[in-house]
Amino acid sequence: RTLSESTKDFRFACAANTSLDYKPGQFYRFVFADERGEFERSYSLCNFDELYGQHIDLVVSQVDNGRATNLLFNCKEGLEAKVTGPFGRLTLPEEIPTRLIIVATSVGLAPYMPILKELEMSGFPEVVLLLGVRDRTEFIYGNVLKGYAEKHDYFELQLCLSREKSSEGYEYDGYVNTQIERLDVNPDSDHFLLCGNPKMIDDAWGYLKESGFKSKNVVREKYVFARESRSSAKAL
């Protein structure tokens, strides 16, 4: 399904009698095969409607001449992949903070979709999503997120536009890092999850560290090629 000019989502059915066992926010490793042989990519689960069923939802942004996107964006129904996982630490904290701030750029939103579903049953008092995009055409799952904000008083959506002017109440001019600085963050009561562009994450972590945050309260996941993890693998 096409979400924007450069972004699509995909659904993979699990093998027979297999269901998902993961923490919302984690990712899986996919081994695909094309005419050049097998290759691996890592993708966060984007399941929202059903967290633990028998399918995996992915969001993929097109990369020029990218091997995975060339395969996925041109595939027909029936494409198969070998999948191992889950991996990753970008999950909800065990201790509920006064305020949870989740930050993403572009398709870095993906792992937060299952997290938002889990939050409906988790009792977090305040959750803020900072989502950075260049313009509104990149605001994927916009209707879902706006509907979620209307339904849940604990949730606030802040869309940061770097190449368009804000006009709606939930929109802000500039980058997510600028918006972080506007939040009056508190290292004693706030907990951060950061996902997306590596530079955004490095800059945000630098600011938060200077503001008194420890690494245990700022969980970071950079969207880069072939992410590594030492978690044990399990075939699906």
Q: Residue spans of the language-model regions?
A:
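Ferredoxin-reductase
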Residues: R1-E77
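Short, Lys/Arg- and Gly-enriched loop/turn segments at beta-strand edges
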Residues: R36-S44, G88-E95, R230-S231
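Short, compositionally biased
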Residues: S42-G53, P93-S106, S211
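Histidine-anchored nucleotide/phosphate-binding helix
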Residues: P111-E120
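Reductase modules of NAD(P)H-dependent flavoproteins
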Residues: D135-L236
